Swiss-Prot record:
One of its GO terms (biological process) is nucleotide-excision repair. It is found in: Cytoplasm. This is UvrABC system protein B. Forms a heterotetramer with UvrA during the search for lesions. Interacts with UvrC in an incision complex. The gene is uvrB. Its main location: cytoplasm. Belongs to the UvrB family. Residues 622-657 form the UVR domain. ATP binds at residues 38-45.
Length: 657
């Protein structure tokens, strides 16, 4: 096994080192569950990386949204540049699952847009897990959803080696069985092409490189990576393992068994519907399943193939579905599961199964799916939490559930290496909250700092924004109706000073890390509920813990239990950090963090390109497409998927001209 090796100019602080040593010892002693309770800004990610290094154990890091997953992926790539850091989230840019609403007799077809880059990264993750031991995968809730059988997937690989003999007919047939398509004109991921004694294969999990095989008769004479765009050799190969284009690809025998099983279940279900006078449901089911069977027999794939996962994986009804966890467990090694922001992530994981089950039961009842589709599901919470792994829950505000599971193995990281204190908390009467906040905001803005305001409703966010605009403040609002790209632009705009105040409903959901913000205003802080719970209040206050002048103002008429507990915890941490700073002569300083690039293409640049493209010769257009493709690959490498998608769309437009 290749060792996990951290590359960093920093070394752990005393508080981090204590947490690292205690958690490492706890896991080595065989404890299944442990919790790291670390305040915002204390360097929990660096602590997590050091625990992995100490344990020398493959790890799966799970979090509750894609933005945080991307941030963690970037950080871990930096910490472990010599190891295999992978990214596994949903590959859908957009996803509308199929559903049926009986009272309206309305069937909603599945509608989705697959992001090719995210699909590549998912395939890269499973390929790495089967090929290497030094793997850390950053994942979202997708890790709990069903995948193909890892043993079947591994059994479909193609082993290539220099000087070995291969029948060309066998090789081409094997590539097709693995899901690769022959395309001698337009070469893309998941394709292969043949030119005499040369076969080029573009692995579905590679970015901008492919594999070239050069034969002398039946003997593999040469093999190397080459750059797809430049068509230049980049690395010689002696051996290479090629993985299929999908985790659901299965061998010929398994496919035949699956088709037979589907046919048998269809017969049983049609008999049930006919016996119960449900002729419409019977006709509907027969038509849909017969079409899927035709596709499976002719191509080995069909739309919605995941609904037949039980047969394709060879499992029994009700059996725990295969998931990303099984790709860790297939080698029999110990591994670590880290649940980041566990106070949000675990409740999200808990609710997945019930919602999925309810929708599919309706589809089965009305003849849109076979009952076996119910086995294409996310893991039940008990199946997830009882996996063979060791678990580490990480949060500034863990729930009672994590603490009860961890028992005596809860470890604290309260001190910040920067010396930053938890923010000062001020209580103000909510009767005049709008006017008081205006006066406080003007002072903060005069010092070139920013303001975050959290309210309870979309309407209030919009109206408060409008009111402050009329008073001359540069202010914007953010809520769930605003898409991901625009949210990113708003956060960027706040940080760069395009405007000074951002108003939102549940700003902590966005995983905001804004060192420029020195004032957090919590409107109607005494209105009990999810948005004003102890956990939410502490998380919201933490947004001001990146700035040396951080302050929180809570507008209220009374002090609720949630407020009281949040204030006491924050003040206790503030006092502890202050005493540590004085003892060690530390001067607090604000966090410094680069502003992320915009996800948008410059509109004027895009329009200019399009206008020129109509008038330019095809050779010039080809050069621009090549340049755009390179930019697209670079954007995808940086996980800037919206930007990559915009570039992809522009490439399509250029090719049509």
């Amino acid at each position: 096994m290749k060792n996990f090796e951290i590359v960093s100019k920093f070394s752990p602080s005393k508080d981090q080192q204590n947490a690292i040593e205690n958690i490492t010892a706890s896991i080595k002693n065989g404890n299944k569950y442990q919790t790291l309770l670390g305040v915002t800004g204390s360097g929990k990610t660096f602590t997590m990386a050091n625990i992995i290094k100490n344990l020398q154990m493959p790890a799966l890091i799970m979090t509750h949204n894609k933005s945080l997953a991307a941030q963690l992926y970037s950080e871990f790539k930096g910490f472990f540049p010599k190891n295999h850091i992978e990214y596994f989230i949903s590959y859908y840019d957009y996803y509308q699952p199929e559903a049926y609403i009986p009272r309206q007799d309305l069937f909603i077809e599945k509608d989705s847009s697959i992001n090719d880059e995210l699909e590549r990264l998912r395939l890269s993750a499973t390929a790495s897990l089967l090929s290497f031991d030094d793997v850390v995968t950053i994942a979202s809730v997708s890790a709990n959803y069903g995948l193909g059988n890892p043993a079947e997937y591994q059994g479909m690989v193609l082993f290539l080696e220099i000087n070995k003999k291969f029948s060309l007919k066998f090789l081409l047939r094997k590539l097709v069985d693995m899901g690769y398509s022959r395309n001698d004109t337009y070469f893309d991921r998941g394709d292969f092409r043949v030119n005499g004694d040369i076969i080029d294969i573009y692995p579905a999990y590679f970015n901008d490189e492919a594999i070239r095989l050069e034969f002398f008769g039946d003997e593999l004479d040469d093999m190397y990576h080459f750059d797809v765009i430049e068509n230049k050799k980049t690395q010689n190969l002696k051996k290479f393992i090629l993985y299929p284009t999908s985790q659901f690809i299965v061998g010929e025998n398994r496919l035949k068994e699956a088709i037979k099983g589907i046919e048998n279940e269809l017969g049983e279900r049609l008999e049930f519907f006919n016996d119960n006078g449900k002729l419409v449901e019977a006709q509907r089911l027969k038509q849909r399943v017969d079409f899927d069977l035709e596709m499976l027999e002719s191509t080995g794939m069909c739309k919605g193939i995941e609904n037949y996962a039980r047969y394709l994986t060879g499992q029994n009804a009700g059996e725990t579905p295969y998931s990303l966890f099984d790709y860790y467990e297939i080698k029999g090694m110990d591994y670590l599961v880290i649940i980041d922001e566990s106070h949000v992530s675990l409740p999200q994981f808990r609710g997945m199964y019930a919602g999925d089950r309810s929708r599919k039961e309706t589809l089965v009842e009305y003849g849109f799916r076979l009952p076996s589709a119910l086995d294409n599901r996310p893991l039940m919470f008990d199946e997830f939490i009882n996996k063979r792994a060791k678990f580490l829950f990480v949060s500034a505000t863990p729930n009672d559930y994590e603490l009860e599971l961890s028992k005596d193995h809860v470890y604290y990281q309260i001190l910040r290496p920067t010396g930053l204190l938890d923010p000062e908390i001020v209580l103000k009467d909510s009767d005049n909250q709008v006017e008081i906040l205006y006066d406080m905001a003007k002072e903060v803005i005069a010092d070139n700092e920013r303001v975050l305001v959290t309210v309870l409703t979309k309407k209030m966010a919009e109206e408060l924004s409008k009111y402050y605009l009329e008073l001359g403040l540069k202010v914007k609002y953010m809520h769930s109706d605003i898409d991901a790209i625009e949210r990113n632009e708003l956060i960027r705009g706040l940080r760069t000073g395009d405007f000074d105040m951002l108003i939102g409903i549940n700003l902590l959901r966005e995983g905001l890390d804004l060192p420029e913000v020195s004032l957090i205003a919590i409107m109607d802080a005494d209105k009990e509920g999810f948005l004003r719970s102890r956990t939410s209040l502490i998380q919201t206050m933490g947004r001001a813990a990146r700035n040396v002048n951080g302050k929180v103002v809570m507008f209220c008429k009374k002090i609720t239990n949630s407020m009281k507990e949040a204030i006491e915890i924050t003040q206790k941490r503030r006092k502890y950090q202050d005493e540590y700073n004085k003892t060690h002569n530390i001067t607090p300083k604000s966090v410094s963090r680069n502003v992320e690039e915009s996800l948008k293409l410059d509109d004027t640049e895009a329009i200019d390109r399009a206008m020129k493209a109509e008038k330019m010769p095809s050779s010039e257009r080809a050069k621009i497409v090549k340049d755009l493709r390179k930019q697209m690959m670079e954007a995808a490498d940086k996980l800037e998927f919206e930007k990559a998608a915009a570039l992809r769309d522009e490439i399509k437009k250029m090719r049509k001209l």
